[in-house]
Amino acid sequence: GPLVEAMRAGSLLYIEEINRIPEETLNVLITVMSEGEITVPRLGRILAEPGFQMIAAMNPFDSVGTARISSAVYDRMCRISVAYQSAEDETNIVHRASPASNKQWCAQVVDVVRHTRAHSDLRTGSSVRGAIDTALVAQSLGELRGKDALDPLVGLDAALTSLSGRVKLREGAVRSVEEVITDIWNTVFAAPSENGDVGKVNAPTGATN
């Protein structure tokens, strides 16, 4: 597997969402991290070649479907806290993922997503993936409707589709997720962009498909 290959090659092993790995599986890495070796049935004892390193990522704020990481694992790792990218970096990420999208429009979509992280009605906002999906969905939705992806209604429907499952309401919030996203969209797109366009639209009166 990837672990044995990385050890034999003396290369980097990257583990995504390490806190979603079952504890009994994760504990296999303890000997690898402390002794640089692992014993595999039929393969025997495997030593890590010089240069072998392991990097793992996790979202500490997402507890659904995650497993407890033991203190023994934490004791063998160094931790770096990584914040969100800057608005400019996120815009570049979105535009790179959806090069057909207008870059100024991508910047506004990123602004919408960044607003979700600080909105008083939301306890969890969206990552840059939400902005990427909004841009991609808007392109596809525009083609299906025979409209430009920059059309305000196309953009709003794309945002509702992409963000409504990602953001979480605070307890006691009186508005729906769709209403909050629509409000944020109108707040961002009501302000004239560099080319003077305004993208404010009315809130949907029914469910968005």
Across the structure, where does each feature detected by a protein language model lie?
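C-terminal regulatory/interaction module of P-loop NTP-utilizing enzymes
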Residues: 1-209
